[in-house]
Amino acid sequence: MQPAKEVTKASDGSLLGDLGHTPLSKKEGIKWQRPRLSRQALMRCCLVKWILSSTAPQGSDSSDSELELSTVRHQPEGLDQLQAQTKFTKKELQSLYRGFKNECPTGLVDEDTFKLIYAQFFPQGDATTYAHFLFNAFDADGNGAIHFEDFVVGLSILLRGTVHEKLKWAFNLYDINKDGYITKEEMLAIMKSIYDMMGRHTYPILREDAPAEHVERFFEKMDRNQDGVVTIEEFLEACQKDENIMSSMQLFENVI
């Protein structure tokens, strides 16, 4: 399997990348596009590209329809329930499930496999720590594995969720110990992991203290009562009032 070509990303790669107006990485000839509500939109997610790589051949022929029919005969259990829980159609869920089972015959993705996936798409840096945090965000029940249900529910939020849903998902990602608060230590760990993942191929090259500065700007904006932690209420209110943050939400999809 060949890693997908690198796309333009924010230099810190985060949902809140515009807090300090961090410049974007530049690569000539490649433009970011807003995901469309189609199968191609699903494939913009690097994890989905990996999962669907064996089920989305270039061009079309009679074998495509045969594959779709075989998918219908082997629907995942609870397909109707998943359709109700997500914003994917039955056909999209079937396609996602087929790819998931092709790459993960056990029906599970463990953390080591998830890290290997992410390493392919960020070869210029070290994605290990960020992949660990992201894995925990997808692993909704905390059992150490991502089930198909975990995957599609999270993906539905990230690609087709409301602003409120996406922000709540991001808060859960940043709240590393899941106690309902984001501390400076947690945010610094997230920022360092994102900067490590992006590597040295950012423009301009980032200073060593850039992650800490980003965290300080984050707390100046989010921590209304200055108690040293950010609650979900503070996070949602501050984000939805900030035009830069709202316009940068698409950048989060590029990292995922």
Swiss-Prot record:
Q: What is the effect of changing D64A?
A: Abolishes cleavage by caspase-3
InterPro entries recorded: EF-hand-dom_pair, EF_Hand_1_Ca_BS, EF_hand_dom, Recoverin
Query: In Gene Ontology terms, what is one molecular function of this protein?
Result: potassium channel regulator activity
Gene3D superfamilies named in the record: EF-hand (1.10.238.10)
Predominant place of localization: cytoplasm
| Glycyl lysine isopeptide (Lys-Gly) (interchain with G-Cter in SUMO1) crosslink residues | K26, K90
Does this UniProt record's set of keywords contain Cell membrane?
yes
* Region of interest: Interaction with KCND2: 243-256
What PROSITE patterns would the database entry show? EF_HAND_1 (PS00018), EF_HAND_2 (PS50222)
* CDD domains assigned: EFh
Tissue specificity, in the record's words, reads:
Highly expressed in brain. Widely expressed at lower levels. Expression levels are elevated in brain cortex regions affected by Alzheimer disease.
Pfam families recorded: EF-hand_7, EF-hand_8
Q: Which residues carry this modification: Phosphoserine?
A: S14, S60, S63
> Subunit arrangement?
Binds to DNA as a homomultimer. Dimerization is induced by binding to calcium. Interacts with the C-terminus of PSEN1 and PSEN2 and with PSEN2 CTF subunit. Associates with KCN1. Component of heteromultimeric potassium channels. Identified in potassium channel complexes containing KCND1, KCND2, KCND3, KCNIP1, KCNIP2, KCNIP3, KCNIP4, DPP6 and DPP10. Interacts with KCND2 and KCND3.
Record family assignment: Belongs to the recoverin family.
Q: Know the name of this protein? A: Calsenilin
Supply the source organism for this entry: Homo sapiens (Human)
- Name of the gene this protein is made from: KCNIP3
